[in-house]
């Protein structure tokens, strides 16, 4: 079992009331595979979930490229029906998903192998989702279309599904606009200050630091609601 890293999400109430605190522990491993440790985008996405935690109970939530699964674990602790997924070609990442569930006493969370852009038996068997999570999955430009193709497939099961994603700005030349148009999707940028994420230290973690993070909500363009 890997060492644990603790994240404490806090909601400061009005004067005289006790704060609401949620603790999440995830494995922390120094490993060449990206999914084996917490990236700055993950804590920002987890903060968005924490800020909107009252909408989560009973929702079907799928985290893609989950790795240590901080956002998905937080969603499960807030009452969502969570499935964690990562590449079946990266068994260490799937194992780290399992370790995260064990650390947080969440045996009900499902873990599946999912390859972006490929419709496997596991992908076909997924139930309709309400929310898809992805923190820093838009890392390699050659993966962008495969990610959106997978999201598009899931949108066919539930056209109202939303893809909540955080993205670390690494190049001004990278853009999703053309691919979103191709796959009939739209994107809304959510200001970090609207969910208390415009700071360098979230959940007592020293993350995201000084990195430039964007919060996106991607949905099916044909869903006018």
Swiss-Prot record:
Quaternary structure annotation from Swiss-Prot or TrEMBL: Interacts with HSPA5, HSP90B1, TUBULIN, UGGT1 and UGGT2. Interacts with TET3. Interacts with STPG4.
Function of the protein: Histone methyltransferase that dimethylates histone H3 at 'Arg-17', forming asymmetric dimethylarginine (H3R17me2a), leading to activate transcription via chromatin remodeling. Maternal factor involved in epigenetic chromatin reprogramming of the paternal genome in the zygote: mediates H3R17me2a, promoting histone H3.3 incorporation in the male pronucleus, leading to TET3 recruitment and subsequent DNA demethylation.
Entry EC no(s): 2.1.1.319
Entry GO terms, CC: cytoplasm; female pronucleus; male pronucleus; nucleus; protein-containing complex
Encoding gene per record: Mettl23
Name listed for the protein in its UniProt record: Histone-arginine methyltransferase METTL23
EC class name: transferase
Pfam families membership: Methyltransf_16 (PF10294)
Compartment(s): Nucleus; Cytoplasm
Species for this entry: Rattus norvegicus (Rat)
InterPro entries documented for this protein: Methyltransf_16, SAM-dependent_MTases_sf
Catalytic activity: L-arginyl-[protein] + 2 S-adenosyl-L-methionine = N(omega),N(omega)-dimethyl-L-arginyl-[protein] + 2 S-adenosyl-L-homocysteine + 2 H(+)
